[in-house]
Amino acid sequence: MRKIFLDRNENNYGPAPACYKVLENVDQNLFSNYTDAYKRGVKSALSERIAADFNLSEKRVILGYGAEDILKQLVQCYLNPGQKLMIPAFSWWYYKAIADEVGGINLEYPLIKGKDSFHYDIDSMLALAETEKPLLLFLSSPNNPTGNSISTTDLETVLTHMKDTIIALDEAYWYHSKDEHAKHLVNTYPNLVVIRTFSKYYALAGVRIAYALIGENLTRIANLANRYLGFNLIAEKIALAALDSPEYYEDIAKKMKSDKEIYYKELGRIPGFIVFKSDANFILVEIPREIKDSLKNFLTDRGLILKFMNEEFLNTHIRITLGTQEENHLVIETIKEFSSSNSDR
């Protein structure tokens, strides 16, 4: 039986055809040679391209082996033992681990759970920052696993009130969100870092490549992230091919948006289910506690692997990655089948 993994927020459509062509046409130099981008006064062809797209100095674009790598570099660059990092209360578990690795202190700021969506509690966030004076703040937008984004207005409020804190905006899922922060904010706020990955939207998680746009005050991380001998040239070429394939990815985004609406409608009809609105490539669903184990087993027996949350306050929730349209239809119909058979007992 084929297993369908919808628990890791990957893009099951796969990368654009142009990405495969890079591998088909790769030549020896990409394997054997170091980069020569430094001859043009830049770090790489990819950082040069991204800088041009955002009208930034190439020195303010850094590359990393996934967003995880850039977040880790930020913490290791700036956070000393005993210093404080603010993170969302409900978010990626690795945020906590990064500070722990350097002896830092994690401070959790709250999210508010509404009827069918979550949102950041900006007032509580700022009050905590005023009291604790954190060195770093991680903001995830859209946030994993709750799917909510921070509005431009709220983000600017945070940036204005926390001028002495480095604000890392993790936009791993930004292509699926209606808000666009980077282009007009990173030039305005010198303490802002906007982090983006090729893993999610571009379906290149295995390639391990991401980038960040950094505010003008953050020269230390720019120096730390620099690699004199360059980055993975094949990965860079694949990433450039993805950037040159907007129509392919826009078509996938439209399919995912349509499927999200079907999830809201179909799962929202099931008694005891709450489907939360999401700006990302996944949705969060609250289910009755008493069916958690039996539903998980029912889905797993049919080859459907979803993320059943075990975190405090989210331990009756499922995070469902948006797969292909066929996969999404199968998940919905299987959950409806379980619900129907369960209600007949």
Predicted segments, located by residue:
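Active-site phosphate-binding strand-loop segment of PLP-dependent enzymes
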Residues: 114-173
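N-terminal small-domain helix-loop-helix segment of the aminotransferase-like
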Residues: 1-68, 73
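Conserved PLP-binding catalytic core of the aspartate aminotransferase-like
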Residues: 257, 267-302, 318, 322
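PLP-dependent aminotransferase class I/II
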Residues: 14-16, 102, 191-269, 274-276
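PLP-dependent aminotransferase-like
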Residues: 77-135, 139
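Short acidic capping loops at alpha-helix termini that bridge into adjacent secondary structure
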Residues: 57-61, 82-84, 171, 190-191, ...
